[in-house]
Structures are given as structure tokens and as C-alpha cells.
Amino acid sequence: MGVQVDKERCVGAGMCALTAPDVFTQDDDGLSEVLPGREATSGTHPLVGEAVRACPVGAVVLSSD
């Protein structure tokens, strides 16, 4: 299970980066993104579920890939 950030939905609130800073960061435009190399394995990280719930616009999603 992996995690993704939908850049079209992201408003840059940064809740995911605050909740799971070792999985998420914010780019130069302030939009959230998954840290390089963490996309495929981050779904099992203990705080990713919290980050998914914390996103105010639902831009952070778990994928079954």
C-alpha cells in the first residue's frame, strides 16, 4: 500500500507534513508531496493514516498499488 498527494486538490495546508514529517514535505510552491523514495512503502507508516485524515481537502490518499 502506498500514499499519494493529489496536487490538483492540495491547498498547501501542510497538515500531512506536520503529522508525518518523515513521509511528507512541501515543495517550493507550498504544496505537499511525498518524500522521494517513500511513495510505495509509506502506506504502512504509523502516522500516514493520521495524515490522510488530517488533510482538510482530501488530497492525501492511500493507494493499493
Swiss-Prot record:
Transmembrane annotation, as ranges: none
Cofactor(s) of this protein: [3Fe-4S] cluster
Keywords: 3Fe-4S, Electron transport, Iron, Iron-sulfur, Metal-binding, Transport
Positions of [3Fe-4S] cluster binding: 10, 16, 55
Cofactor note: Binds 1 [3Fe-4S] cluster.
Gene3D superfamilies for this protein: 3.30.70.20
Stretches assigned to the 4Fe-4S ferredoxin-type domain: 2-29
MF (Gene Ontology): 3 iron, 4 sulfur cluster binding; electron transfer activity; iron ion binding
PROSITE patterns in the cross-refs: 4FE4S_FER_2
Described purpose of this protein according to its UniProt entry: Electron transport protein for the cytochrome P-450-SOY system.
Protein name: Ferredoxin soy
Source organism of the structure: Streptomyces griseus
Gene: soyB
